[in-house]
Amino acid sequence: GWKDWLNKAKDFIKEKGPEILRAAANAAIN
């Protein structure tokens, strides 16, 4: 169900969020 998907998304963001933000910041700077 959508709740399972939501939990997976939350876990993914918890793991990858900082990485993605760093990449976005680097892209914005360059």
Swiss-Prot record:
One BP term from GO: defense response to bacterium
InterPro entries: Poneritoxin
Entry's family note: Belongs to the ponericin-G family.
Tissue localization of expression: Expressed by the venom gland.
GO cellular component terms listed in the entry, alphabetical order: extracellular region; membrane; other organism cell membrane
Protein's name in the database: M-poneritoxin-Nc3a
Top-level taxon: Eukaryota
Tagged with keyword Secreted: yes
Primary residence: secreted
Biological function: Membrane-perturbating peptide with multiple activities. It is insecticidal, since it induces contractile paralysis in insects (L.cuprina) during several hours and death after 24 hours. It shows a relatively strong and broad-spectrum antibacterial activity against both Gram-positive and Gram-negative bacteria (MIC<20 uM). It is also antiparasitic, since it potently inhibits the larval development of the major pathogenic nematode of ruminants (H.contortus, IC(50)=5.6 uM) and reduces the motility of adult males of the other nematode B.malayi.
Keyword terms, alphabetized: Antibiotic, Antimicrobial, Membrane, Secreted, Target cell membrane, Target membrane, Toxin
MF terms (GO), sorted A to Z: toxin activity
Coiled-coil region: none
Subcellular localization: Secreted; Target cell membrane
